[in-house]
From Swiss-Prot:
Highest taxon in the source lineage: Bacteria
Protein name: NADH-quinone oxidoreductase subunit B
Upper taxonomic lineage: Bacteria, Pseudomonadati, Pseudomonadota, Alphaproteobacteria, Hyphomonadales
Native species: Hyphomonas neptunium (strain ATCC 15444)
Main location: membrane
UniProt EC number: 7.1.1.-
Length: 190
């Protein structure tokens, strides 16, 4: 390289500080108020929120609250043909280790407090999938005196899967919709 070539790393004597480095002036936008800009625009918060929601969607742990015949279709979704684990969703036996509860089947008045107790044991953020006509609105037994007309009267439901019974494909689609919902929602409150 010749002495006349452009050297972006070389500073003139006028711009060099006492330490030999560049001293920013008061009008330098990078150094003045960087934390103010981050607080205002939330760059770091948005990036962390995207990272957290990506991690949550790729590691959903689900548990079953299988009450009737819809639970059989739920078992099909976990088998090799549909394989929910390839989407990052694995079954768990304890509510304390799960993020998603699948309510599948007819919910009776006697079973409703147990459903609420299991839901309360789940850590935040927690999600509920209502699977089948019976869990969605009472289904075939809607007019029975002992049936809760939808599990959304007991716990907040995020995804409804219709059908009697819904297929395993419908459950996989419901899980994918739940992943989209988690990505859309933020997890960090500002």
């Amino acid at each position: 390289m010749s002495d006349n070539s452009y050297k972006p790393y070389a500073l003139g004597a006028a711009r060099a500080g006492v330490d030999g480095g560049f001293k920013p002036g008061n009008d330098d936008p990078f150094y003045s108020g960087l934390s103010d800009q981050l607080a205002d625009k939330g760059y770091f918060t948005a990036a962390a929120d995207d990272l957290i929601s990506w991690a949550r969607t790729g590691s959903l742990m689900w548990m079953t609250f299988g009450l009737a015949c819809c639970a059989v279709e739920m078992m099909h979704a976990g088998n090799p043909r549909y394989d929910l684990e390839r989407f990052g969703m694995a079954p768990r036996g304890s509510p304390r280790q799960s993020d998603v509860m699948i309510v599948a089947g007819t919910l009776t008045n006697k079973m409703a407090p147990a459903l609420r107790k299991v839901y309360d044991q789940m850590p935040e953020p927690r999600y509920v999938i209502s699977m089948g006509s019976c869990a969605n609105g009472g289904g075939y037994y809607h007019y029975s005196y002992s049936v809760v007309r939808g599990c959304d009267r007991i716990v907040p439901v995020d995804i409804y899967i219709p059908g009697c019974p819904p297929t395993a494909e419908a459950l996989v689609y419901g899980f994918l919709q739940l992943q989209k919902k988690i990505r859309r929602e933020g997890s960090i409150e500002r």
